[in-house]
């Protein structure tokens, strides 16, 4: 009995050590931003985005608290084979008070298996909800290739000259499928699937690589239900991206072409089972970030996007912007962001334009333009001149001449745009990723 009692503390100590080691192996990653701001004419901070543009210049122009909290762990490993469990809980609130009710969203819940197929060394197998190989422009928070969602796939298959990835993901619409239930017309959500194939790591020149992608999206109505007449049932997206290393940074040049339902979000997610989005989209994009030396760094973007819809409800969007950074010390810097957006309506022929300039003093954890966490104080000036906008559901109620989601010119009776105005905002913000 005494021998058993002496062994018990030793067993408990070993178990505690094992549990502690496992707990320390949990990966905690994430992103967050939050702050406080005011508008020169009074009230809380306003944020500025050109009507018809898909994004806005974000420095000193974010009016919400947003966070992504990621927990993950390698739960099994044997040799070079392993399983990794990954999660991501995200939320967004308007940062107006201490307690703000919010329903968090599980953006990611997936398992990734590495080297599980003997004849495909280095390949990863995965299933679940996932941020899948997203491509974005950070300074305008613009995701131009993003099929994230529930799905499954096989990635990083080494072909010798490049790496092949294949996946299927899903992003469904709230309605769009019509049928009859008990002899009454019934509308149900429509499943939208995207089938994605990518070939990456193609070496074209010293320091330069090419990635090619093909995405096919389709609406998948359940048995006994069909899509609305004229709805966009499917579409394609073709992407070519060249990445060039420059000093300690990079430049990315992107060409994209989309058809029909893939012109709805223009990022690889198809949509349109409830609307007619048949047509085509062409995008030419160049963006990058470079740390030139210990004093200077810069982000930049220039893009042309043309959406030509069969229903004449497309648009042409130009945007160009820069964000130079001067580093006073390894942890203190000054940033100036200047951006211009111009959006022409295919239906009205008129343009909406906006200039936005932000000056920020920043303290960050390091001397790179990517160093975070950062605390910044900022002042923003925006000026816009708009002549058209999209009708809302409330606009269309009781007015048979208007259709929600359709572009219209401003008139003396109704204003759809923000008009012609300017504004100043100022405040403080923190931003972190880890």
Swiss-Prot record:
<keyword id="KW-0626">Porin</keyword>
<keyword id="KW-0762">Sugar transport</keyword>
<feature type="site" description="Greasy slide, important in sugar transport">
    <location>
        <position position="433"/>
    </location>
</feature>
<keyword id="KW-0813">Transport</keyword>
<keyword id="KW-0472">Membrane</keyword>
<protein>
    <recommendedName>
        <fullName>Maltoporin</fullName>
    </recommendedName>
</protein>
<feature type="site" description="Greasy slide, important in sugar transport">
    <location>
        <position position="370"/>
    </location>
</feature>
<feature type="site" description="Greasy slide, important in sugar transport">
    <location>
        <position position="31"/>
    </location>
</feature>
<keyword id="KW-0998">Cell outer membrane</keyword>
<dbReference type="GO" id="GO:0009279">
    <property type="term" value="C:cell outer membrane"/>
</dbReference>
<dbReference type="InterPro" id="IPR036998">
    <property type="entry name" value="Porin_LamB_sf"/>
</dbReference>
<feature type="signal peptide">
    <location>
        <begin position="1"/>
        <end position="25"/>
    </location>
</feature>
<dbReference type="GO" id="GO:0042958">
    <property type="term" value="F:maltodextrin transmembrane transporter activity"/>
</dbReference>
<comment type="similarity">
    <text>Belongs to the porin LamB (TC 1.B.3) family.</text>
</comment>
<dbReference type="Pfam" id="PF02264">
    <property type="entry name" value="LamB"/>
</dbReference>
<dbReference type="InterPro" id="IPR050286">
    <property type="entry name" value="G_neg_Bact_CarbUptk_Porin"/>
</dbReference>
<comment type="subunit">
    <text>Homotrimer formed of three 18-stranded antiparallel beta-barrels, containing three independent channels.</text>
</comment>
<dbReference type="GO" id="GO:0046930">
    <property type="term" value="C:pore complex"/>
</dbReference>
<keyword id="KW-1134">Transmembrane beta strand</keyword>
<feature type="site" description="Greasy slide, important in sugar transport">
    <location>
        <position position="66"/>
    </location>
</feature>
<dbReference type="InterPro" id="IPR023738">
    <property type="entry name" value="Maltoporin"/>
</dbReference>
<keyword id="KW-0732">Signal</keyword>
<feature type="site" description="Important in sugar transport">
    <location>
        <position position="143"/>
    </location>
</feature>
<keyword id="KW-0406">Ion transport</keyword>
<dbReference type="InterPro" id="IPR003192">
    <property type="entry name" value="Porin_LamB"/>
</dbReference>
<feature type="site" description="Greasy slide, important in sugar transport">
    <location>
        <position position="250"/>
    </location>
</feature>
<comment type="function">
    <text>Involved in the transport of maltose and maltodextrins.</text>
</comment>
<dbReference type="GO" id="GO:0015481">
    <property type="term" value="F:maltose transporting porin activity"/>
</dbReference>
<dbReference type="GO" id="GO:0006811">
    <property type="term" value="P:monoatomic ion transport"/>
</dbReference>
<feature type="site" description="Greasy slide, important in sugar transport">
    <location>
        <position position="99"/>
    </location>
</feature>
<keyword id="KW-0812">Transmembrane</keyword>
């Amino acid at each position: 009995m005494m021998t058993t009692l002496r062994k018990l503390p030793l067993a408990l100590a070993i178990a505690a050590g094992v549990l502690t080691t496992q707990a320390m192996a949990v990966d905690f990653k994430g992103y967050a931003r939050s702050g406080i701001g005011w508008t020169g004419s009074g009230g809380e901070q306003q944020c500025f985005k050109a009507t018809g543009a898909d994004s806005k210049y974000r420095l000193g122009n974010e009016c919400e608290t947003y966070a992504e909290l990621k927990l993950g762990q390698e739960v099994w490993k044997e040799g070079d084979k392993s399983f990794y469990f990954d999660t991501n809980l995200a939320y967004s609130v308007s940062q107006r008070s201490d307690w703000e009710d919010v329903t968090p969203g599980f953006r990611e819940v997936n398992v990734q298996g590495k080297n599980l197929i003997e004849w495909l060394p280095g390949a990863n197998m995965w299933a679940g909800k996932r941020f899948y190989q997203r491509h974005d422009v950070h300074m305008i928070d613009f995701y131009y290739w993003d099929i994230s969602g529930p799905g499954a796939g096989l990635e990083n298959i080494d072909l010798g000259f490049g790496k092949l990835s294949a996946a299927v993901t899903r992003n469904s619409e709230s309605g769009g499928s019509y049928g009859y239930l008990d002899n009454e017309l019934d509308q149900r959500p429509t499943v939208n699937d995207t089938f994605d194939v990518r070939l990456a790591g193609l070496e074209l020149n010293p320091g330069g690589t090419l990635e090619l992608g093909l995405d096919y999206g389709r609406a998948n109505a359940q048995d006994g239900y069909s899509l609305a007449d004229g709805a966009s049932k499917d579409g394609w997206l073709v992407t070519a991206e060249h990445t060039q290393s420059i000093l300690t940074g990079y430049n990315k040049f992107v060409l994209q072409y989309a058809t029909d339902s893939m012109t709805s979000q223009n990022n690889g997610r198809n949509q349109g089972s409830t609307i007619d989005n048949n047509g085509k989209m062409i995008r030419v994009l160049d963006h990058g970030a470079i740390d030139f030396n210990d004093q200077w760094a810069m982000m930049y973007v220039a893009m042309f996007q043309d959406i030509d819809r069969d229903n004449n409800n497309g648009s042409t969007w130009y945007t160009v912007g820069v964000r130079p950074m001067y580093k006073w010390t390894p942890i203190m810097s000054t940033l100036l962001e200047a951006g211009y957006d111009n959006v022409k309506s295919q239906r009205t022929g008129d343009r909406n334009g906006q200039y936005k300039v932000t000056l920020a003093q920043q303290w960050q954890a390091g001397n790179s333009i990517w160093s975070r966490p950062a605390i910044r104080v900022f002042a923003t000036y925006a000026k816009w001149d708009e002549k058209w906008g999209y009708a809302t559901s409330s606009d269309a109620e009781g007015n048979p001449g208007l259709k929600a989601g359709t572009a219209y010119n401003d008139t003396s009776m109704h204003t759809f745009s923000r008009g012609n105005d300017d504004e100043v905002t100022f405040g403080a913000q923190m931003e972190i990723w880890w």
